Every structure is written in structure tokens, then in C-alpha cells.
Amino acid sequence: MKQIYYVIQTLLRGRGSNIIKVLSLGLALTMSILLFVRVVFEQSYDTCYRDPDRIYQLFSIFTINGEQGEPGELNLPPVAGAVLENFPQEVEAAVSVCKYMAFGPLYNGSVRFKDYAVMADSLFFQTLGIEVLRGDPLHELQQKDVVFLSDRLAQKMFGDEDPVGKVINYDKQLQLTVKGIYAALPENSTMNPEAVISIVSAWSRDWAEYSWEGGDSFFQYIRFRPGVKVDVEKFNARLETVIHNYLPQDGKDNSSYTSIVKPLRDVYRSGDMVKRMNAITLILGLAILFIAAMNYVLISISSLSYRAKAVGVHKCNGASGGTVFSMFLLETGIVILLSLILMVLLLLNFREMIEETMEVRLTSLFVFGRIWVPLVVVLGLFIVGGVLPGRMFSRIPVSQVFRHYTEGKKGWKRPLLFIQFLGVAFICGLMCVIMAQYHYVLNKNTGYDARSIATSDIYFDSDSERDAARQFFCGLPYVEDVESASYPPCIGMSGMRIMDESGQSLFSSRYCVETEN
């Protein structure tokens, strides 16, 4: 207890420098922990599914005039079924998922829900290993106008009412019956819909093409059987042969198509942008934490001149070097604890801004499985900030009580100051580069002027309905002009192959259907 009393008195006596320590470490811990947790969050993508190592994603490769394109996530509709049919010994399940046919909102009565939905076949939950809480998707998703909701969306829509059997509306077009509930998926998953609509609902209305000649708009996944050792190269070679047997062989086209598989666990993590951002985030977090630790060490060692006599007094009263060392560790622990309290206050008060900047909820970042990240950061800071100065203080001799301490040698300060200034210069330079890139992207010429333009997704069954809506918007006094297009440039466009007169593929091009203006 005496040690705690002496430590508290020491902290109160040097409260000016200790306030600086708490502020410095609080800000550094906030930033570094957020950055490190974000990296771990990114690296844990697609681990929420059951046995994720058995799930593989299909990718399409188009070749035109001998030029092979990059693998793309969108596949021809029948590919997943062909894989399941031709590899019964290896593949347990396969699924086709379409996103673009489920872009519209869901309605419960007049209440609109713009939650992420997809259309998928009956093997969706079995293939991805998503827990189904109620309902039989193998049977129900073979019927049209059927939907399964996540427990999160079901709670949002119906509260404590039983959602099964209720009828909701998709985009004012389809009446969907809720047939089941499944466990909601976390944010760090590439396929995490809040609603799964039976894809039969689209096929029965001819909303999309289902053939080997087009309609490559489907995300597709396969699940290998337990115990199957997947040699990706050999499997892809066999898959290429299977796909070739299904493709039309009319001899007129100079293009070809094949599919490959990649482990779902690696698809997101292996992206160039993800790897680059993780590297930058990790370096920035380490730099911030290192600078804060060096700042703490520098402030602590700087107090050596006026704390040396106090340490000597403790030793005259029987304190050993270990006791002095433990007192300094306790002091460091209290400072770090106060810094953690400051960090929590910052996270709570700036939560909305942090979540908007990081594009993920704090509750998703700080789950139980990632608590080790802040613990490791705090432990590392405690070792660097407590052990190094603590050993210096514990070695002060008893004779220091009878001497006037003068700080004759200052060479030890210069390396620390150099490292600190170097780190600050690095972070400032990195932030300047990031701000310059942000300014460039924000002001880059996109080819169109987005000022005073409002966009919305509206689907019409006929040209007459579209024209009527256009006349309505044109009649509004605050509207200058109205235009409609199948794929606005700010959203993206679909693609199609351009043929010559003989039917040979020349190239693939983006296209957009628009009205006369």
C-alpha cells in the first residue's frame, strides 16, 4: 500500500508532465488500436462461414482474338450447376447468386427497407455454410416469390412478431412470402445479404438470360466435401475441359470462355487494393505507437534530474532496486490506464465520425475474437514505456541522496529526439501524400458534371410508364431537365461483345441505353 501511496504522490507532484503523457498516449492508443484492429478485421474476411476453407469461388475468363482477360467474379448462369453435376465425388454443393436483380428496396406495408438483398437458388445456405434458424431452404427456395430474412432484418421489420408466413414487397413489383430466418452475417464477409429471394422468382419472369451464350451476371460458389484435398491447378484444368464440352461449338466465333476456382478465404485478402491499404495502415499504426512510446520514454528519462534524490531516499529507507522498478511499472500502468479511459471517451464521443471514416461499425471491430489486438498494443506500450526507464531509475545508487545531481551527459537525448522527429516527419509526409491523392481524386475530371444532379433507380415495365414519369418530373418547377439511361455513368455500365459482319468477336465494350437527350 505504501508503494501505491508514493506512486500517486509522485504522479500528483508531476501532474503537468503526466497530463501530457496521458493526452499523448490516449491519442496514440486510439489511433493505433483502431488501425491495427482494422487490419485484423480485413484479414479475417470470410471466416464467418462454416468450414470456410472448403468454400471456393468461381471466376470467369474470357478470351477474344487470343487475348485473355483477367478473371472476373461474374459467371455464366449454368456454370455452378455444371460443376456440381460433373464433380460429384469432390463437390458437395454449388450455388448461383445474383445481386443486380435484387437492387430494389423491400417494403413491409408502407415502410421501406434498403437492406442488402440477393437472389439465389436453394443451395445458398448449404454451400456457404450459413446457419438457418427456421425454415427449409432446400425446399422453399425452389418456389417462386419466396424470401428468407436474416434475424437482424426480421427484428427490424416485425419486432417481436413471428415473421414466418408474413408477406412483404420487393420494389413494388413482387409479393414475397417469408419462409425462413437465418443468422445474420458480420460485415467482414463478401456475401452477407439481409434477405435471400428465390432466384426462381426472376427466372419465371424472364428477368435474365439463362444460357451458355450470355448472361454472365452471377456470383457462384462451390463447397468441397470434407476430406477432399484440393489441387487448384489440376481442378481448374479439369474444369476447363468440362466447360468446353458445354459451350456452343458453331465454329464462327473467335472467342472462348472458361472458369477457374479460388479459395474464398483468399479472394478478398489477395486483392491489390486490400493488400496495399493494409500495409499502409499497419505502417501508420506502428509509426504512431512508436512515436508515442518514445515520447513517453523521453519525458520519463528527462525527469531523472529531479527524481534521482527521491529514489535515493527510498533506497535509504530499505527499498531495493526491484521495489523502485515495480513502483515505476505501477506508475506507467496508472498512466496507461488513464490513457485507455481517454481512448474510450474519444471512441464514444466521435463514434459516428470514426465509423463513417472507417466504413465499419465499432461493434464489428471490437468483437471478442479481436480483443487480443488492443491487449497486445497495451502490453507492448507498457514494456517499452515502463521497463526501459524503470531499469534506469532502479539503478540509481543510494549515494545519490548526498550528491547534487547534474545532468552532465545529454548525448542520450539526441538519438531519442532524432527518432521522434524522424517519425513525426514520416507521418506528416505520409499524410500530405494522402491528402494530395484525396484532392486529386475529388477534383479529377470524370467527363461529366455532377453538380445539381440527383439520381435514383426506377424500373418501368414499358416505355409509356417511363415517359409518363419523365413528364411528371419535367413539370416540377425546380427541375431543369430529366434524362434516363439503363446504366448511368456514375453507377457503372454492363458489357457486351461487339461482332463483325461474319459473327466474329472483335472486342468487349461497355454499353448504355439512353433516351434522346
Where are these predicted regions, by residue range?
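Membrane-helix entry/capping segments
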Residues: K2-I4, I8-I19, Y49, R238-A287, ...
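Intracellular coupling helices
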Residues: I4-L12, G16, M294-V335, R395-T406
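Short, strongly hydrophobic transmembrane alpha-helices
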Residues: Y6, T10-Q43, D53, K413-Q437, ...
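Alpha-helical transmembrane segments of integral membrane proteins
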Residues: I20-M31, N278-L298, E331-M343, V373-V378, ...
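Small-residue-rich transmembrane alpha-helices
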Residues: L34, H244-N245, T332-R395, A436
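Membrane-proximal extracellular/periplasmic loop immediately following the first transmembrane helix
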Residues: L35-F103, E213-R223, E233-R238, K262-D266, ...
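Short juxtamembrane loops and helix-capping segments at transmembrane helix boundaries
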Residues: Q43-P52, E194-V196, A202-R205, V261, ...
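Mid-to-C-terminal secondary-structure elements
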Residues: D121-R134, V147-M273, C474-D481, A485-N517
